[in-house]
């Protein structure tokens, strides 16, 4: 799997050319292009605009890349009329157009895609014949995560806590471990420079772990 962000700068062009060549050098059932695109609303109304999607499609086509699947991102519900419009102007079947819906947990996104038939369409396009799983372990995991009731407060100490993305993998690991144990995490960010011998006990009050203070 290769992810490439479509931008109008020279840095991304070699990657786009590389995936074009990958498609050209392999059988059609071995390569699949998925285009993720924003479907914005008109300010002051809920009207969805498909022009940005049509424009990005034409940009890709000009580079020799034809998307097989469209994943649409919008805060509003993508109606069948919108899908048909994109299908018409972007030359892709309606069943190849799905919405990335707003969900409570990011782990619900695959379930949302399954409900919309994305998994079956991918199997069809790649000519794969895979057996249905006997047990839906992913759905069971999401149900377990969402049913977590107990709360645990964890402090994450770092030098760059103002930029939460700098510790995103650590934060996600803590949340995943807590979910699996039946807990929800109240994550607090602690700036390491503010921790001194005089302030450490005060700063670390209220956390779930035992303290030596």
Give residue ranges: language-model regions.
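N-terminal beta1-alpha1 cap of cysteine-dependent amidohydrolase-like domains
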Residues: 1-213
